[in-house]
């Protein structure tokens, strides 16, 4: 699907899409072609661990988060060095990929909080916009339909904290 999306975007921009090695979906191993609840839950649990810094955890028979980033980020760095850091280049680069890889790479590059990245999936054909800033760093200027600041969804607060406290059998004074 990413190739088809790239072809549509390329057609709109009158530019041929270019396939770049390293930019592709997460290799999910034994979870490939499965969409049952167990497979989705297993993927989501491991993917969450990646966002929380446990990048060496592999998908069953598939990639680790480190392997995804090790193939994906150098391509983005090369594009940045070749085009975006060149003061004679005055345009944008569109990289078409898959949501899980995009969210992981963008969160790492731009320092987007794990909870936000996990709470905000990208719909088909949605994008994340990164812009280069100083010292090789990136800033995330759009995530799907959202713009900064990027905060995780607020945790639900009990609707009746006073009533819940009154019903408690524990003496709040000690």
Predicted regions and their residues:
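Short glycine/proline- and acidic residue-enriched helix-loop micro-motifs
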Residues: 46-67, 164-171
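Short, conserved phosphate/pyrophosphate- and ester-handling motifs at nucleotide-, phospho-/glycolipid
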Residues: 98
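Active-site signature of alpha/beta-hydrolase-fold catalytic machinery across serine-
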Residues: 8, 104-108
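Loop-to-helix element that buttresses phosphate recognition and phosphoryl-transfer chemistry
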Residues: 1-9, 55-75
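Glycine-rich phosphate-binding loops at beta-strand->alpha-helix junctions
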Residues: 1, 101-102
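Acidic, low-complexity terminal tails and accessory targeting/binding regions
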Residues: 15, 26-38, 81, 85-91, ...
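Phosphate-coordination/substrate-recognition cap region in phosphate-metabolizing enzymes
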Residues: 1-47
